[in-house]
Curated annotation (Swiss-Prot):
Residues 74-494 form the USP domain. Keywords: Hydrolase, Membrane, Protease, Thiol protease, Transmembrane, Transmembrane helix, Ubl conjugation pathway. InterPro entries: Papain-like_cys_pep_sf, Peptidase_C19, Peptidase_C19_UCH, USP_CS, USP_dom. The active site is at residues 83, 440. This is Ubiquitin carboxyl-terminal hydrolase 27. It comes from Arabidopsis thaliana (Mouse-ear cress). The chain crosses the membrane at residues 30-50.
Amino acid sequence: MVSRRGSETKAIVCVLTDRIRISNQWVSHLSFAGLLGVAGFVFAQQHGLFRNLNNLKLFSGREKDSGDDSFLVPGLQNLGNNCFLNVILQALASCKDFRSFLQWVLEDARGSLAGEQEEQLPLTFALSALLQELGTVGSRRSVSNPRKVMVTLTDYAKNFNLTSQQDAAEALLHLISSLQEEIVVCYRPSQSSNLSDILFSRNLRMLAPSEGLHGLMELKRWHKHLRGPFDGILGSTLMCRTCSSQISLEFQFFHTLPLSPLLHHGGYNIMSGCTLEHCLKKFLNTEKVENYFCYRCWHGAALKYLSVIGAAETEIEKLRSCGGEDQCDCKTSLHLQRMPWSNSYSHILKQLIIARFPKLLCIQVQRASFNMFEEFKLSGHIAFPLVLNLSLFTPSSIGVNIEERIEMSSEYQKPEASKNHGMYRLVTVVEHFGRTGSGHYTVYRSVRVFSQEEEEEDCDEDLSWFSISDSEVCRVSESDVLGAEASLLFYERL
């Protein structure tokens, strides 16, 4: 079967060959080769493959050494199909909070580790050094080597081949989990405290009994090791709209938010005008849960049923005093098996909530999809902002009060108390070209270009964007970045 794009290319070739046929004689082989080149160029233009053509030096009107355009960040060597890891490393280099986290871990471990940091924390040490190198802005082109990070990462992610094409989002998760494993194993409680005294309660609160002020400080130190800048918390709540009761509330940590785009009818292309906010609403939207048994609704219906049939007051009182939990045996003990009951009595809704925002928000746009024959890639642009406001997705904004149910210490609540805790700034965009399971990754990353005197001012006017494809680096505009068909988006909390 010939693909749709293959058919279009063939059609372009046929049109052009018809126009240059002279006296029923074909043009030379050289001309025909040129013809194929023209056809390929036209095809690429029609499918938007050259939308960033102006970024190439061949088509750029910029002078290499003119003004600030001479400033560049280092590229990364491709050591064999590891572009998926290179874009993650470049992305992390633009995440100030992540670099600071690694530096804090190394500084905190300096006094407690018996050996050298490079031996005890090899991945943390290698990654921190590489990210510092990638954050250096210079006037000359330079290329860094990710080999040390790859070697140390392989020791933790043994089943993840770093020299064959992989998914960039999966590489990020392997890197984060490997760092956590290394940091937690090398953690040493200070003085006489014991890790066994630090307990985890069911509501995710960590407790340090009988430790006093020292125990609280140790708890904060352990908590800082445990939670990285990518750690957020998702809440999942089940609510019955019939009886207005909250059936369950569960929490789980997340490192990335997997968002599905809005699709055209048929599900092969992303809907025109789709935005990141649309994807977030879809992810957090309420959904009806079928075939779910609401015990509170059932007990209410059972009370009415017993009253109608004239049951004994003792049975009614027993039913009324029942808590309606999962271990309830009212149905058998009160002979209510014959009571008419169906899910029509209950209207159960499931709602996801971002209960705690991470310092660094990584959004994964799920472009891989399946039909009954094959896996394919969802093409199309999703509009994303330079500044993202997540305050619209807090529990209070959607009418669900969960604050009273999350008993966490005030130290954990402080980051959420800020009125700007839901505001994020875009720092990196990862883009994938080609089909699922193959192709090539590139990255757009933001860098602040300033002098030493201006470093503390942290002005948005000094923010520059670079397009990076392994070792190739060029400066681009914000419009180029916003036009990317993003696979991963990295946002930093303001």
